[in-house]
Amino acid sequence: GKNRPSLVILLGQEAWSAYISQDTEIAKKTPSICGMVSVNGLVLPDDSIDTRVWEPESKNIYTDFGDYNIVAGYVYEYDVDKNIELMRRFYPDMRRVAFISDNTYGGLSMQALVKKEMEKYPDLETIWLDGRTETFMEVSERMRRLPQNTCVLLGTWRVDCTESYVIGNTTYMLRDANPTLPVFTIASVGLGHWALGGYTPEYHAVGKNIGAVTYDFLDK
């Protein structure tokens, strides 16, 4: 109809996830551009659900949304395989991967991706340090007690199960809980003071690029 937009621009993970969760004709047919979103994402459930126990399936923007009219986008990709390869290169005796994620959409989205990718590595045990069900202090204590031959893969940590935003030096405090643990990062969190390294997306401002693509699309 005359009130249908010519284009929808979606910035950020939450906006993108909310949009692709709309199973409607207008959402699927309206041209859309996304920015500051990852290749992996989640489709939100229809009804209210206890997110502490929700086990969502990781979806891929390239392969799972062919029925949506996505005309352009600037996305970043978390590469679990390259990080496992890097960890094994440094620590060939690694037997376990402890993954840290928080009580946010981004944290759960990363956790769903890592769960999917870790199915390729049946020889590795995965330990979930999950801010949906654990407080910062509980995660810190579990870090202290992690067994030998464990490497940590750091996702994100901003909000724990109390829904309190944690302060900026939280990663320093987690580091100090077990300073000898080898830690790698999938999202650049902890680089420079805790994580040894990691394959992370190349985050960058996309406003000008999206503006140019939008202008070109509407000017056709």
Which functions belong to the PLM regions below?
Residues 1-220:
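Short hydrophobic alpha-helices and adjacent helix-cap/hinge residues
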